[in-house]
Amino acid sequence: MNNVKSGGRPVAIVAERYVVEKEIGRGSFAVVYKGHLADSSAGNVAIKAVSRSKLRNKKLLENLEIEIAILKKIKHPHIVGLLECERTGTDFYLMMEYCALGDLTFFIKKRRSLMDKHPLVRTLFEKYPPPSEHHNGLNRVLVVNYLQQLSSALKFLRSKNLVHRDIKPQNLLLSTPLVDYNDPAEFHARGFVGIYNLPILKIADFGFARFLPNTSLAETLCGSPLYMAPEILNYQKYNAKADLWSVGTVLYEMCCGKPPFKASNHLELFQKIKKANDVIQFPKHAALESAMVDLICGLLTFEPAKRMGFTEFFSNGLVNEDLSPYEVESEPDLETKSKNVAESNMFISEYLPTAERNKRASPIRLGDSCTLRGPCESPQGADPYPQDNTQSDQHEHLHADYSFQVEMGQDGQQADGEEKRKLYNNQEERSNEERQFGQVSNGRNQEDQLLLHQGRGQIPCEQNRQALQSHSHVAAKQIPDKDSKSSVSCQKHAASAPTKNDHRTTRLKEKTKCSYSDLLLEKEYVVVEKKSVEVNALADEFAQAGSGAPAIRLPDQHHNDASQALQMARHSSTSVSAANTAKQTLLRRNSRTLSSSGASTSRRPSLVDRRLSITSLGATNALSKALGMASLRLFGNSHQQSSNGSSTFKQNPNVTSLLSPQTFQDMTENAVLSADHQWDNSRQADVLHDDSIMKALENLTAKVYAIYSFAEVKFSQIIPLPPSSTQDPYTHKRMSNGSCAIDDEEDDIEHSPGAETYRKNSSGANANTGNYNFSLDTIHEMNLNDLPPNDLYILCTEAIVLYMKSLSLLAYAMHLTSKWWHESADKICPLKLNLLVQWIRERFNECLEKAEFLRMKTQSIQLHNGNQLSASTMVSEPVFVEKLIYDRALDISKTAAKMEMQGEYLEGCEVAYSTSLWMLEALLDDVSDEDNYNDDNLGHTGVLDKSDKEVIKRYIDSIANRLKALRRKLSR
């Protein structure tokens, strides 16, 4: 892309012939601009710019390459065409057909506003008025017209053995009619179907498409949940019929103005679809003909085998209905307005009033520099920080990247503080960099798309970027306090002066919450959430299955607020530290029960909550004490224990003691010391037997525990726990450099810049109750004082790759468990296996959250301390997780050897040797391609060659021999 000057201002030129104009659409990985040919302002195009920096793993890059390859091969009048593609060192540019009327959602959800402002849309809906003012459904003529155009494109795709996998209104674009033709004959001669003077539907966004013959099955989770076939939602293999389900949902929405099924999460959506039992409910105001109802019901059939097939669909009466009678009468007004729209060179959203365009959520995440720097000027009068004035009864067309606030419309009433805190915390939890490419629609206006997506937003021009950066720190940190104060203020007002509007406000809040859930689900992509949901769903199934004994009861989902955990800590009658008490409470609550019951579940606790769960090893016997002491001395972390070396937990009557941290601790200790080292991936075919699956899980659990513990050390250095108020004979101070502090009894932390911050923040702690006043803001400030930005950035990077390695092993463990479970005839599992599965679920969710939190922290460091980060840090050698684990394993084994030679802490030496062995063996595990991760320099896998593995095997043999000799010594 080149920058030249035209008329005194810079102009961006792509492929030496396309001029870049305003931004008209935005997604997670791409920005769409309006453009035109350099030698003619009449040749409009849509320029899709994809930054290579956003495609941070192989899957995302593959999706883009697939989209380019498919669009190059297919040419159809009802599919958005690819005109040209250019690759540069930093970006991909796709020059595509320009669709000035946006996408189908504009006609459905913005119809009323557009009728007032858009001349072509007003004329169109005057001729084909909506069937009812009570819903947003379209006139039957428009519905059938677009149904036929959609079916024409699908028929072409099937002839090429292609399945789109993401058909939804946002990917159905509308182009201006009567632009380069004048009559029906010419219209149909060009291959178009339908009515010649209506906007023309075109399928867009092939980021998820793939070649899939009729006889083939796929199992990749793709698409948008509200329009996703149930077999995909349930992680079953699927075929091209999945597209027909999506067609059914689009057809239903065109008729009724809303999707057929709504839910707050994917599993609940699946349960609702299944519970409907193929009985589709239609709004009472939507008077549909029987043929339309039959077609929708045939497409929305739960079982793919019973669902209408392509042959039946393509031969349906509505799909083949003769629409020529609607073309008999000439419509000069439509033709004139179409040409005026084309000549005006305005995108559909530019016709909306500023207030309507700004009726969107306010961004609170900060973006990086714009992908494309050109003449992208903010529209005159547009607010660069649009506040959310969204009416709660209207489902706005938003990209649900969890980066917006919900406020209460024109009444000025804000959503309650708790709900807004959940929205804010959700930003910390979502993993956008794992989202698949393709969530871009041309049908979004420029102001709407000033949303700054979580951690990776893009701003269309340099001046906006600088302005937002100047407000970044304040915006990010003021939101929680602002929410709390607003909530308190509203509550006081309600208590002192109740009004007759209270009930209406309550209903408005409830509707806003529903709309929020709808928005999240409507646009959410779940390719990378597949494993997360699978892990939790399988663990739920195990927890409910039992094993002759009572089933493991799941955590109470109605009380997962961190404040309750702290309250419990404050009023505990036992002399247990606040951290231990909070750990017991949160551990019971943090199992994300995305249950198959269909009930809406609460959010995962935020990192502010979950930070409390990183506490001591609750030792109750000599072996546990040795493990706790050894981990403190060998790993050098700051975990605390109670004064007598044991922990007392206040048991929640709603949860059995089987889910207590002590049970998990004893189980993992046993796995580290006694799991079968002989099991490896080559024996995965044996997992159909109960004893084999147990050996496999114990083996993987031990490896995960060793690497996870190392990751926890890194995490505790980034966000340290407040010091325990109870003196512990095994307490060992953390070294700021992360080294093992075994031979060095003096600690530099007491004299570090962060030490005073520790003392200030722990001064309010009560020695008996463990009452800590510890906020996220304080932690952030303490961290920046404790470690320089360079060290903190490297530390975060190392912790991320360790958590990711743990995640890959945990996912593999659940894959083996799922295989055993679904091929088991009796569906009865041993209690120990059940506990292992619950532990794996706990660690998976925790590692996922912390890895995402750390990723955002690295971005925050770059944003706030970019000029302080040395160039060597930003361009240094990538962090290899294999080298981290290898070096740590050797350090642990060498330190244990010194202790053994001195005759000290022999039980701890046994744990150390075992831990070192598991870490080295984990390096030899083969990870499938889809589990590899490569996020810039965040974790490079698959780097060990044959000679490296031979070296590791020699160390494994050597350490194993020392461990055998030590155990013989201990048995005497």
UniProtKB/Swiss-Prot annotation:
One of its GO terms (cellular component) is vacuole-isolation membrane contact site. It comes from Eremothecium gossypii (strain ATCC 10895 / CBS 109.51 / FGSC 9923 / NRRL Y-1056). GO terms for biological process: autophagosome assembly; cellular response to nitrogen starvation; cellular response to potassium ion starvation; cytoplasm to vacuole targeting by the Cvt pathway; mitophagy; piecemeal microautophagy of the nucleus; protein localization to phagophore assembly site; regulation of autophagy. Homodimer. Forms a ternary complex with ATG13 and ATG17. PROSITE patterns: PROTEIN_KINASE_ATP (PS00107), PROTEIN_KINASE_DOM (PS50011), PROTEIN_KINASE_ST (PS00108). Residues 359-394, 424-444, 467-506, 562-605, 743-764 are annotated as: Disordered. It comes from the Eukaryota. This is Serine/threonine-protein kinase ATG1. It is a peripheral membrane protein. The gene is ATG1.
